[in-house]
Amino acid sequence: MNSIWARLRLASSQLPIGGYSYSQGLEAALDNGWVRDAESARTWLVDQLQLNLARFEAPLLAGLLRAALIGDWAACDAASERHRASRETRELAQESRQMGFSLHQLLEALPELDAPGRAWLARQDPPNLAAAWAMAARAWRLDAEEALSAWFWSWLENQLAVLMKTLPLGQLAAQKLASSLLPELDRACAEALRRPAVEGSAAFGLALASMTHETQYSRLFRS
């Protein structure tokens, strides 16, 4: 089967894992005035890509994806635990748990994931999103680059949806922003595949946005 179908499926906004309930700190950045228009939104997103996702989140996920594809369960355990420990706020931890749980439930209901993958995922109590994403890649026969590019696209599409609802950003403006960000997305994905996973990150702006969001007076999103 052509792997493009599985990649589109994994990246799709129709994947029922609740991703569009979360803004990953962007709603708080808007409320605090750090993001005010399309230009400042682009700066925020490029910083996230270059300073956080490409250097920490995505290399960690790439390692987990590679381990999952070959069935190196000890390496999967280590990467999953590192991902769990790296969530800097309660909101971000709950987001990863809820989305991981929902993706686990989906994989349990579908036939593609093999017995070793199901057994490992069942031992994660509950699985975080990175763990479940890696098992989805195993189930749907995606290599690390394919599954990671789906993850990056899902992230970007989510952030654009947040901007359209809260800035607000029009659909055409959102597509123009997407066009300007696609080269950055490509570079971030390539860098993440080259980098080894590291022990931790220091995304202070994201952590502060997430913490202030927990006490924000009015909000649309859960993070």
Swiss-Prot record:
The keyword Nucleus does not apply. This is Urease accessory protein UreF. Gene3D superfamilies: Urease accessory protein UreF. The lineage of its organism: Bacteria, Pseudomonadati, Pseudomonadota, Gammaproteobacteria, Pseudomonadales. It is found in: Cytoplasm. The gene is ureF. The keyword Phosphoprotein does not apply. It holds the Pfam family UreF. Keywords: Chaperone, Cytoplasm, Nickel insertion. One of its GO terms (molecular function) is nickel cation binding. UreD, UreF and UreG form a complex that acts as a GTP-hydrolysis-dependent molecular chaperone, activating the urease apoprotein by helping to assemble the nickel containing metallocenter of UreC. The UreE protein probably delivers the nickel. It comes from the Bacteria. Belongs to the UreF family. Required for maturation of urease via the functional incorporation of the urease nickel metallocenter. GO terms for cellular component: cytoplasm. It comes from Pseudomonas aeruginosa (strain ATCC 15692 / DSM 22644 / CIP 104116 / JCM 14847 / LMG 12228 / 1C / PRS 101 / PAO1).
